[in-house]
From Swiss-Prot:
Domain named Ig-like C2-type: residues: 24-104, 119-172
GO BP terms, alphabetized: antibody-dependent cellular cytotoxicity; cell surface receptor signaling pathway
Protein name: Low affinity immunoglobulin gamma Fc region receptor III-A
Extracellular side: 21-206
Gene name per UniProt: FCGR3A
Length: 249
């Protein structure tokens, strides 16, 4: 009886754990994908997550609610005050991880999707100009050395990142008759030998589930062998027992 109650309790624990794990996080997506923009740029943030047709969306900027209840939040003319951390949530999903938006001033800005990459990943760099003003003779630099030159402004792609791509990057180009340069950004390349923290965290609900299932299997297996042992013992006692007949019976 105790084993049956324990198995039932464990099954209820598994059910509750899987239901909690089934609620996904919402995700904030930037369009365009760059999280570093210039003043007057337009930026669209999209909240992706499980939702019903009439669900409301909750947006937070630096922890404060935004009066926006739809899936997209549009910044038409970005200013410094739009910089900061953005998060979103739907009625059917948990609060998203934060996405950082940086609004800068200047003629040129080196844009990159993020500053930390894993070995083997694609790195995309863009020399972005204020109000998309035409730029020519664009050159990308790493640690002060020229790496790529374009007569017309183009993105610079590094197909597979290695440790050699660690360092400080900036771009330079001619706008009108002036030679302009962007501020430098530091890019870090991490080794790929160990899984990332986010990858480990994404699988954490499966770990206790696996342990509980293994425990259930062990309990059931133990009960099976215990019953088999008792049956063999009973059969053996029956065979070895002597039956005494009395004439009067």
């Amino acid at each position: 009886m105790w084993q049956l109650v324990s198995s039932t309790a464990l099954l209820l624990l598994v059910s509750a754990g899987t239901q909690a794990a089934d609620v996904p996080k919402a995700v904030v997506v930037l369009e365009p994908k760059w999280n570093r923009v210039l003043t007057m740029d337009s930026v669209t943030l999209k909240c992706q997550g499980d939702h019903l047709l009439r669900d409301n969306y909750t947006w937070l900027h630096n922890g404060r609610p935004i009066s926006n209840q739809i899936s997209t939040y549009i910044i038409k003319n970005a200013s410094i005050k739009n910089s900061g951390e953005y998060r979103c949530q739907t009625d059917q999903s948990k609060l998203s991880d934060p996405v950082q938006l940086e609004v800068h001033t200047g003629w040129l800005l080196l844009q990159v999707p993020r500053l930390v990459f894993q070995e083997g990943e694609l790195i995309q760099l863009k020399c972005h100009s204020w109000k998309n003003t035409p730029v020519r003779n664009v050159q990308y630099f790493q640690n002060g050395r020229g790496k790529k030159f374009f007569y017309n402004n183009s993105e610079y792609h590094i197909p597979a990142a290695t440790s050699e791509h660690n360092g400080s990057y900036f771009c330079r180009g001619i706008i009108g008759k002036k030679n302009e340069s962007s501020e430098a950004v530091n890019i870090i390349i991490q080794g790929s030998s160990l899984p990332s923290t986010s990858l480990l965290l994404s699988h954490w609900p499966q770990i206790p589930f696996s342990l509980v299932m293994a425990l259930l299997f062990a309990v059931d297996t133990g009960l099976y062998f215990a019953v088999q042992r008792d049956l063999r013992s009973s059969m053996g006692n029956l065979k070895n027992s002597k039956v005494i007949w009395s004439q009067g019976s």
